[in-house]
Curated annotation (Swiss-Prot):
Its EC number is 6.3.1.21. GO terms for molecular function: ATP binding; magnesium ion binding; phosphoribosylglycinamide formyltransferase 2 activity; phosphoribosylglycinamide formyltransferase activity. Keywords: ATP-binding, Ligase, Magnesium, Metal-binding, Nucleotide-binding, Purine biosynthesis. Residues 119-308 form the ATP-grasp domain. The gene is purT. This is Formate-dependent phosphoribosylglycinamide formyltransferase. Pathway: Purine metabolism; IMP biosynthesis via de novo pathway; N(2)-formyl-N(1)-(5-phospho-D-ribosyl)glycinamide from N(1)-(5-phospho-D-ribosyl)glycinamide (formate route): step 1/1.
Length: 393
């Protein structure tokens, strides 16, 4: 039975969030609604989730000693990773010592790098994936590309938001793609995955919730990527009953293997009735921001319920919905957003501004949300809203 105490008192139920981006911010808001005391931790001050948490700490998230010190001082009931770049070996140690890591420390460790999760999916679970090789050197990488053929995709084994990811179309791209992958890895230069290109029709995120009552699948989320980073998403993505059933089978297998409770974002490629596993995040997914307008309980609310052991009897979908990112390019520590009235002038629209403290280059600073009679109309409406927002540096 779940019991939640009073925040900032001896009975408080404490959650420590590792990583404080826009997704973490929404998770904190949902936990706050349930009377949970939230401690936010990230590598920079005034990160979005810190702005709505009870208190915060700034540390190097890859420093296991610093991470352990904060966790031992705060004594949280739940440790909730919101990003991949964390000292996961320390989380494994802490879990073995009795701390509760969401969904599990093993899940955060396996999904922190593409090799762990790919080997689990393809080699242990025998799920369909693209053909792949791993390489540590330019020589091995060149051999892998020759073996897989063109086109193929290269990514650092440890990166996020498309950093270091390239599509190789010919030998002319070989050196450039290698250099870009070496620059884009979270741990600096290192290992890469080379994947044979799948001729898919579309890709989806199947948001999957493991909770006290079992596993619940949300309506599939379609999305459009540029340079590995999401630009817009929509729900539901139309797909054949066979493809949907296969997507749910793959998602169930992966999330069961990872274990624990919480929401997972399972990324899949689809062509006709065929489905291939791509990646999984053991936490809310950026493409799932659309659920802020498409569902009665967003992915963030569902994650909070699952973490706390609360039931999820039903997930109500409000109809065709879409999200479009606000993705400016510039430099500022005091960004402003104007023309919001125009952006919100149509019915069934909403905006989330993330409150990121600075921009230096291209950065996702917000998202526009819309509902309509069809997915196409919702996408067009969300895009109109996003384009109406004027970003001032």
């Amino acid at each position: 039975m779940t019991r939640i105490g009073t925040p900032l008192s001896p009975t408080a139920t404490r959650v420590l969030l590792c990583g404080c981006g826009e997704l973490g911010k929404e998770v904190v808001i949902e936990l706050q609604r349930l009377g949970v005391e939230v401690i936010a931790v990230d590598r920079y001050a005034n990160a979005p989730a810190m702005q709505v948490a009870h208190r915060s700490h700034v540390i190097n998230m890859l420093d296991g000693v610093a991470l352990r010190a904060v966790i031992e001082a705060e004594k949280p009931h739940y440790i909730v990773p919101e990003i991949e770049a964390i000292a996961t070996a320390t989380l494994v140690e802490l879990e073995n010592e009795g701390f509760n890591v969401v969904p599990t420390a093993r899940a955060t460790q396996l999904t922190m790098n593409r090799e762990g999760i790919r080997r689990l999916a393809a080699e242990e679970l025998d799920l369909p994936t693209s053909p792949y090789h791993f390489a540590d050197t330019f020589e091995d990488y060149s051999k892998a590309v020759a073996d897989l053929g063109y086109p193929c995709v290269v990514k650092p084994v440890m990166s996020s938001s498309g950093k270091g990811q390239s599509l190789l179309r010919s030998a002319d791209d070989l050196q450039k793609a290698w250099d870009y992958a070496q620059e884009g890895g979270r741990a600096g230069k290192g290992r890469v995955i080379i994947e044979g290109f799948i001729d898919f029709e579309y890709e989806i995120t199947l948001l999957t919730v493991r909770h006290v009552g079992g596993t619940t699948f949300l309506e599939p989320v379609g999305h459009r990527q540029e340079k590995g980073d999401y630009q817009e998403s929509w729900q539901p993505q139309a797909m054949s009953p066979k493809a949907l059933a296969e997507s749910q089978r793959v998602a169930q297998a992966v999330t069961d293997a990872l274990g624990g409770r919480g929401l997972f974002g399972v990324e899949l490629f689809v062509k006709g009735d065929q489905v291939w596993f791509s990646e999984v995040s053991p936490r809310p997914h950026d493409t799932g921001l659309v659920t802020l307008i498409s569902q009665e309980l967003s992915q963030f609310a569902l994650h909070a319920r699952a973490i706390l052991g609360l039931p999820i009897p039903v997930v109500r979908q409000f109809g065709p919905s879409a999200s479009a990112v606000i993705l400016p390019e510039g430099q500022s520590q005091q960004t402003s957003f104007a023309n919001l009235g125009a952006a919100l002038s149509e019915p069934d629209t909403a905006i989330r501004l993330f409150g990121k403290p600075e921009i230096n280059g291209t950065r996702r600073m917000g998202v526009c949300l819309a509902r309509d009679e069809s997915v196409e109309a919702a996408r067009a409406k969300a895009t109109r809203a996003s384009q109406a927002v004027k970003v001032e540096f």
